[in-house]
Amino acid sequence: METTEELSTFLTAATVDGILGRLLYRGAAWSLMRKNGVLPQNAPPLGATIETDLAEHGFALLRGAMALRAQAGASELTGKAFERAANAFEALVRNGDPESPDRGFRRTIAAAAYHLAGFSAVAFSIFNEIEEDLNVSPGEIAIRHLILRDLDQLRGFVRDWLNYGAHGDEQIAAALQGGDADVDEVLSTILNTTICRALAFFDFALETGEVESFEAARGLLTTAVGLADNAENVPLWWISNLCRHLIDDLWQHSLHQNLPTEPPEGAEERYPDLRRLFISSLYARKTSEVELWPSQREAAQRSTDVTDDLVVALPTSAGKTRVAEIAALMTLSSARRVLIVTPLRALSAQTERTFRKTFAPLGFGVSSLYGASGLSAGDEDALRTREIIIATPEKLDFALRSDQTLIDDVGLIVLDEGHMIGPSEREIRYETLVQRLLRRTDAAERRIVCLSAILPSGDELDDLTAWIRSDEPGEPVRSDWRPTRQRFGALTWRGKDALLRLDLDDDGPFLDKFVAEKPALGKEKKPYPRKNSHLALFAAWEFASQGKRTLIFSTQANWVESYGKQVVDLCKRGYLDSLLEDETPIARALEVGKEWLGEDHPAVASLKVGVAIHHGRLPSPFLRELELLLSEGALKVIVASPTLSQGLNLNAAVLLVPALYRASEKIKGEEFANVAGRAGRAFVDVEGLIVHVMFDKIKWRKKEWRELVASAKARTLKSGLIQIVAEILERLSREGVLDIDDAWEYLANAREAWRSPEEEAVVAERLAAAVEYDASTDDEDETDDEEETIDEEPLSQLVERLDATVFGLIEALDEVVY
């Protein structure tokens, strides 16, 4: 047996990037490019023995990682080794020969290795994307059910196997004593039965939290590993050994082990029962939720201290909602209420559905307040009585101005999308509301949890943390971990077809002729695609045909409906087929859309062929129905505006980015980072693919794309109020106003001092040149239309916004509240 030092030395060397002639990179390219196990003729040379090399490398890493984990426990090195082993086995099964007899065995190994590397969502997706017929052993089937978190299926399968007469101990003993049985077959039956019995114990442990059942399961699997070793049954040695490590890892990270047992102060009576119900309700879901991800564990450990204000910076899809739910559980167990502030109406509706699903089984009511800023009697009643309230800043601000006591018994405020602080009207409103909440005289009695996917690092994050924590010492919760990986590529039109590159390397993996030219139909003479938006739509249809949900990101809201018009037109002309097989799931959304928008509106007409058109200007009732369809996965193609970059959960397997500019200005890396985070759905996709669509100007577009990907980063965070004041002072200085001797008296008494003659002239020129809106030009290839940035706004407009804000700020800072 190797020592810990020997195993560590081996794994350190074996996990070096680029080892064995970049074997894992070549393996990924090999698996991505082939179809049913066969590479295209124009594929680059990837190695004649690549399949054997991948298998040998994968098994070596897996053996070493399990041995080191058994001796020294899980570590960063074992996690890296499991991940690299999983990469190798994934390459062996992805797009492989469907007739290969060992494809099921290798897929089980890939999924288990990903799980042990900390990527349970990728492990789930490895199994979730394939058909049932995998030529697998009963033990592998049981492991598959566990990884898919289908514990009902696991219980049913294990029960049937264990209750089958031929699998009983007496029958097996009789078969061995009779002398006629195939000993290897009998030993396989014993091993598979032991695995099933162990998983029955483990399922009970996950349901009840009883450590004795877990220990029994682990003991059975240790016996199975020894028996398989003695019998030289190599496949079942791997499976039973992996299963032993798998249940050990899952138990270690389970809610039973990670959700604190120590109640918050004052919650000694209610917390134990609520904790049990919380874990049980998550366990009982169709897809059981039984563990915490690496990104969630620190926040969970800090959750019991209800005076510990948290700033949580996790990537998109990394589990921020579960962090908020755990914090809410602690507060509710203390008999205090929870308030969740979401800056977008659509996000409020989405959050309401999520929290109702989690907390309704625990007996707590959930309501959301959004829409117009007024407050109805029903709104006020909900805000005063519901245990969990979700509200937009506008609604909450109006309510608190009417009655400050409405949230006196609220013990937790969750600030969703906490990065939305900046110079826009919505961002300033959010910032001012947060300041108002922090300045309440009872603020110390109320916990604040601030969530975001794109918070900055360094001093800016420290400043935000100090602000939220009112300068109390404490660190933010920060993690770069994502549940799925991502790949950046490009779709390039070549005159007759399009090449899809699956990374940014010119020598990397590609799919040839991913989109082919469509000949002209009827009386038309020109083939399709004819422009960038056509190419994006044809690519979306191709991805959808592969079962990959596709999101087209439009950098401008006014382009979104143009896509809807093109979808309808191309379907009508016969260049695209409907993506819907049955209109029943969308019937209600269609009716609501017809009522509010009319049957011919692009958002309604495109819905009829299975495409969602989403932007913030659509009527709220229709958006609610549309978002419900999206949450159910009923639509394969979505076209969305920048709203999604502000937190709306519209995740997809593929993100198509046809344009990189807005109003002649390139989108910023921080916005792109958040948008790109939408690619790759946990528990659905193994990886997310972000693709720039390039119909023309290929060389320039490719350069711009690489620069944008390289610039993708967290958001720069700075007070919107400070930004506006700084911009006004800069403008006044530029105009020479601040050079006047009595500048401040002049500014206080002369309205014209706050206006720039040059800017006023530009605005007048724009108004004079304004033309009536033309629906035929609302396409990304032809026009720009977007909100002005702070440095583009007229000085007078900035001053008006600051003027309105200052009154609210003074009130927030100085008013006496209860």
List the predicted regions and their residue ranges:
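A short beta-strand element within the Helicase C-terminal
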Residues: G411, V637, S641-Y661, G688-V693
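N-terminal accessory nucleic-acid engagement/regulatory domains that precede
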Residues: M1-L277, F543-S545
